[in-house]
From Swiss-Prot:
This is Anthranilate phosphoribosyltransferase. GO terms for biological process: L-tryptophan biosynthetic process. Its EC number is 2.4.2.18. It comes from Corynebacterium glutamicum (strain ATCC 13032 / DSM 20300 / JCM 1318 / BCRC 11384 / CCUG 27702 / LMG 3730 / NBRC 12168 / NCIMB 10025 / NRRL B-2784 / 534). Binds 2 magnesium ions per monomer. Its cofactor is Mg(2+). 5-phospho-alpha-D-ribose 1-diphosphate binds at residues 84, 87-88, 92, 94-97, 112-120, 124. Belongs to the anthranilate phosphoribosyltransferase family.
């Protein structure tokens, strides 16, 4: 039951068209510990949806939920995360997930925070599970997997259990809420660098500013021709957070990256098992060119953020080389056989 003091804070927030960051943290913190009744959660989410998500809403909610998250021992410097908001309705192959594996095979330290599908047929967890990459690792074994492979997956519900307090209301509302935007921001690894796709291009600058507030040193926010990916079917809008804290906005075309141009239909995917098979084909060099170039575009951005290359084009070409010479295929063949969820240490 919502306490009188908590209800007072909520009412003040609902009546405030321009809340501060501190006020947002104050109103979202009770939500992380289940202090709101469902009707009050619905009022908060609907109000933010109606007036439009602001910097304070997103940054404040992220800080409140990160404070309540279960910790992960490897954090910050040298880590990169990649995710998208989803909700673009395109139902493409798992581009960002596949690109993350290419980047990890090329030495980028990827701690990917994700979940099962919400708005598409296959979320990152669904396709990784189909690739025999373990999901339900305890913290110690997730660290071991990362140290062995440069990659580990942090299953969002395991590290952000506070989100469960809002799930019934989200499902009942049946419209997008601030939590569609929040998911990619809540990695307990608090990565130094991040690429995030947004289905709503109006959120690009806003998310870049939130990244800066959350301590990211370099980040890319992208919206590709209606999708939450770097597009090989049209123009991609980019907001780049640089190390000096400035945010630069620009556009890129597939040709700028040295890649082909395709249609969105060329990238349509299916269930997690189907997308996993498509990914294996791309890694083996037998998949469609559209799949190869789409994954290379996003992996290239990860190499760029990591400081391995000087441009997005150079990054895409590096990704193509890793696919062409079999590096990524060999990486997957090696590491899908490691399952620390079943491997007992000598101290067990």
């Amino acid at each position: 039951m919502t306490s009188p003091a908590t209800l007072k804070v909520l009412n003040a927030y609902l009546d405030n068209p321009t809340p501060t960051l501190e006020e947002a943290i104050e109103v979202f913190t009770p939500l992380t510990v289940g202090e709101y009744d469902d009707v009050h959660i619905a009022a908060l989410l609907a109000t933010i949806r109606t007036r439009g998500e602001q910097f304070a809403d997103i940054a404040g909610a992220a800080k409140a939920f990160l404070a309540a998250a279960r910790p992960f021992p490897i954090t910050g410097a040298g880590l990169l995360d990649s995710a998208g908001t989803g909700g673009d309705g395109a139902n493409t192959i798992n581009i960002t997930t596949g690109a993350s594996l290419i980047a990890a095979s090329g030495g980028v330290k990827l701690v990917k925070h994700g979940n099962r599908s919400v708005s598409s047929k296959s979320g990152s967890a669904d396709v990784l599970e189909a690739l025999n990459i373990p999901l339900g690792l305890d913290v110690d074994r997730a660290v071991k997997w990362f140290e062995a492979s440069n990659f580990t997956f942090l299953f969002a519900p395991a590290y952000n259990p506070a989100i469960a307090h809002v799930q019934p209301v989200r499902q009942a509302l049946k419209f997008p809420t601030i939590f569609n935007t929040l998911g990619p921001l809540l990695s307990p690894a608090r990565p130094e660098r991040q690429i995030m796709g947004v289905a709503n291009a109006n959120h690009g600058q806003l998310i870049a500013e939130v990244f800066r507030e959350l301590g990211r040193t370099r980040a890319l926010v992208v919206h590709g021709a209606g999708t939450d990916e770097i597009a090989v079917h049209g123009t991609t809008l980019v907001w780049e957070l640089k190390e000096d804290g400035t945010i630069e906005h620009y556009t890129i075309e597939p040709e700028d990256l040295g890649l082909g141009r395709y249609t969105l239909e060329d990238l349509v995917g299916g269930l997690g098992t189907e997308n996993a098979e498509a990914m294996r084909a791309t890694f083996a060099g037998t998949g469609p060119d559209a799949h190869r170039d789409a994954l290379a575009a996003s992996a290239g951005a990860m190499f760029y953020l990591n400081g391995d290359v000087d441009s997005l084009k150079d990054g895409a070409q590096k990704a193509l080389s890793l696919l062409a010479d079999g590096t990524t295929q060999a990486w997957l063949a090696k590491h899908e056989e490691i399952d620390y969820s079943e491997k007992e240490s000598s101290n067990d």
